[in-house]
């Protein structure tokens, strides 16, 4: 897509640097979406003229930008700006060539032809050799046939033999129909001419480091997580994983694969053992053989409820790798490379069998009055009192998830606080409310709660929601919210938490897709429209950090001074506390009498230190635990679903409602007007 704009002259005199153009001072109009009519209202001069129709013009400071090209059109200088297309979400390696305007997904060059990523092809000269391009890597391998009968038929011009009939495992398949035998997602069979032909999928070699790859559910081959962005390398060099290889350089990828850098494309050839030596103990590539062994000679291994053929390998429990060797299962422990620390931007992940350095997840924090710290590290304050989109997936029209926050003023004119958090995931709505109350689709629930798509539990003093979509939400039951986004969501999110692309300068992109220069305009653009009345009295401006009496200021600084104490000192050199200190003072200056408003800033700073692997000595349970219920109630993750009140305390009968998490009156007390009291103190009926 091209955007056109004209070039105007402030003074009409010959331009010495650009022949044929009658101006020396040039201004671009309509570069940033400014309407031409509006721009012309405050600019004077005339459109720059030129002589040679159709000539491409070089204009200093304008055409230096590779996205802008100026031509002589109708005797006037007309410039066009290229608008870059959005790259596919499946693109794992985006490159930008020097002098080019737009990024593109890294493809492959092979034998003089160019191929897009994910493209597979075979040539007439080598019909049984499969080639596939995946982000700058061409994987060459033989077509791997799977034969399940004693009398397979060979066909001229076909790579794989076929077996008679289209009945497999008792199921009759139609002509042309494809299926996966035994639920094996790596083998595809098809019914062709009344016979069955089966092929094993060959996984392409990936360009990303191993720790950035994963195998999606229901698929055979791994894919790269997220998207890496690099400049195209000169001299035909290749980027493979985290290393750069010179043009012509070769290396052994594994026992079965040799890779060579050829003109910026890494060509990896997988060798396959001949069927006659498949049973050789020295053959390291036996699992890559064509399975042309008669069924009675095929040795299989049963492991649990699964059947594995000879040579197949699989991961087992307790970090073991198992293999089927001549009908016997052999297992050994995975050998881990010791890792003690990670480079900047990486975090040590100990969740798997072996500790590895992985990309840090994005973290967005909301706390206090409220203060927002985006995924990319931009900090701002916003005191709106409605419901807003904190984050959602903007990479698809129908967002698979979104997180909403609802704010209220809590009887103040200048500030607001986060009152509740709402996670909308598919057909489920999870509400995290005050005092750690949890509702699922409107009903209060007990903890822990497990579903196929999310898990909710109390983690210390925080309520934690973990989703399969890659989001993790922590809530303290008061006004602290932390959203953690997995690296594969990078560049896909939007909302008050920003777009998570690694650059905080463009975090203020509003709900209409336009950049906002004012924080309030940005935040209001993410307001959720509803019929609920959410306005408050006219907002009182706050010209300084802390308005109020001397007593209020002294209390604010006295409480917030603890951030500078020995409890947090071990973290000061790694995480700057000044922003948290200012937020703390702001919160304390209009803090309700019954609240410890410094807690949110302390908690936010503690979490930031913990993410850097630094332990601080501050314990929120001592003075800030949100689980400390008020008016005699106690917190229970599975309290009674039937509430005892002054009206029903002496009724006898079982409670058929499920237990729920939240604040409950102890067994010897009843609830009356929001307080837990003894039954004898109930008013006379």
Swiss-Prot record:
SMART domains: C8 (SM00832), VWC (SM00214), VWD (SM00216). Disulfide bonds join 364-497, 386-534. Residues 1-39 form the signal peptide. Pfam families: C8 (PF08742), TIL (PF01826), VWC (PF00093), VWD (PF00094). The keyword Cell division does not apply. Residues 629-682 form the TIL domain. Glycans are attached at residues 30, 116, 255, 318, 441. Residues 50-105, 108-163, 164-225, 238-289, 299-358 form the VWFC domain. GO terms for biological process: blood vessel endothelial cell proliferation involved in sprouting angiogenesis; BMP signaling pathway; endothelial cell activation; inner ear development; negative regulation of BMP signaling pathway; positive regulation of ERK1 and ERK2 cascade; positive regulation of SMAD protein signal transduction; positive regulation of sprouting angiogenesis. PROSITE patterns: VWFC_1, VWFC_2, VWFD. Residues 362-535 form the VWFD domain. Keywords: Disulfide bond, Glycoprotein, Repeat, Secreted, Signal. InterPro entries: Kielin_Chordin-BMP_Reg, Ser_inhib-like_sf, TIL_dom, VWF/SSPO/ZAN-like_Cys-rich_dom, VWF_dom, VWF_type-D. GO terms for cellular component: collagen-containing extracellular matrix; extracellular region; extracellular space. It is found in: Secreted. The keyword Cytoplasm does not apply. Inhibitor of bone morphogenetic protein (BMP) function, it may regulate BMP responsiveness of osteoblasts and chondrocytes. PANTHER family: CROSSVEINLESS 2 (PTHR46698:SF4). Interacts with BMP4. This is BMP-binding endothelial regulator protein. It comes from Mus musculus (Mouse). The gene is Bmper.
